[in-house]
Amino acid sequence: MTTATTSGDLQLENRVEALLDLATRAGADAADATVFGSDQISVGRRMGQVETLERADSAGVDLRVFLNGQIAQVSGSDLTDNGLARLAERAVGMAKYSPADAFAQLADPDQLAQNLPILETFDPVEPSTGAMLDRAAEAEEAMLGVEGITNSGGVSAGWTKSSLVIATTNGFLGSVQSTRHGLSVSGIAGEGEAQKRDYDYSLAVFGEDLKDPREIGLEAGRRSVRQLGAKPGATAQVPVIFEPRVAVRMFSLLMGAINGESLVRGTSLLADHIGKTVIAPELSVFEDPFLKRALGSRPFDGEGLPVQERTLFDQGVLTTHLHNLATAKQAGVNPTGHASRGGASIGIGYANAWLSPSEQSVDDMLKDAGEAFYVTSLMGQGANMITGDYSQGATGFWVRNGELAEPVESMTLGGKLQDMWLAMSTANDLTWFGGMGTATIRMTGLTIAGA
């Protein structure tokens, strides 16, 4: 058996191996399974008062069985021998009446990941509830001290320790432990119907890598206050500049367009674009699952295949779609190690993908634009991933003479994704949001509808 561990949980490994044995005994031709466990602490505070203080732990199991070309997927939370036996019998019973699936499969043994790196996804230091409450208090007090803030929307601090084990009947056993620390603050500025609310937050694998609580609170306060007096702006066609927090949503549209599931369903506008220029030639998109201390890192994908560093867009040119075993077989290509687990179902995911930054500062980007719309919030989904039609509500600031001017709201952006991607550029402020990173993005060719 290929064993691939990164500080795994031996008890969970024992449970997943027992489950696969039970599935085989129940009649399955093959099977794969995940067993997971988590321990969480969360605290909440508002206006100096503790509102929540919770600790919870959970465990669960997902099983997929193969029987004569038919598959069934089941989930459960009983990890006892009897509980696992019932789950295995239920899965095999369901598979007998399931339709055949010509594409679902396990990896060949020689495709499986091995010799895995240590990714530093686990922080051994568990924070005390007292330390988390102190952190929350410091952040809220800083936010309330910002001139113009009239109330607190609340502050929350959290910590999660997770263990995940994936195993297959054809020889893979992989486990990983991870941690996540978080702190978020929401501020309220103004009174009555003129109130404005915004937030700031920080997430990290290691508690010591969180942003300073005072910095988070001050930023939440400043972001709330600066929206006061916002009104709909005029209809115009000027450059649109997305701050990183919303730029990552634009980047996610691009990443969604190369998802293998969309490709095989016929819902990707980039289905036939490998080898073609899709984004501005000055830009590339990279993926590195092996970044140390990063929230998106992983040593193997959801089917036990190896992951690797990739250039997904090379100087504007699309180099690959993202595939798991099933979508790769359906598309007639090799899997790329991008399987993800959502319960017993297999999807597509990526690990630490980022849009290349430039050397231009945000200030210089604003100055070069002269007049522009600087977007700080987007509303709704607004993208047709088959046609590329894009329309989305937005708020932010008008840029005049290269500087942020009055706040604006109730604006609507419209354009064509294909044109927007080719006409975008980035600043030098690369910012990470979980497993995705992007800098400030500038796009041209959009219509901005306002008052």
Predicted segments with their positions:
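Dual-mode signal for accessory low-complexity, basic/Gly-rich regions
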Residues: A271-A451
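Active-site bordering "gate/hinge" segments
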Residues: M1-R298, G302-L305, D314-V317, N401-E403, ...
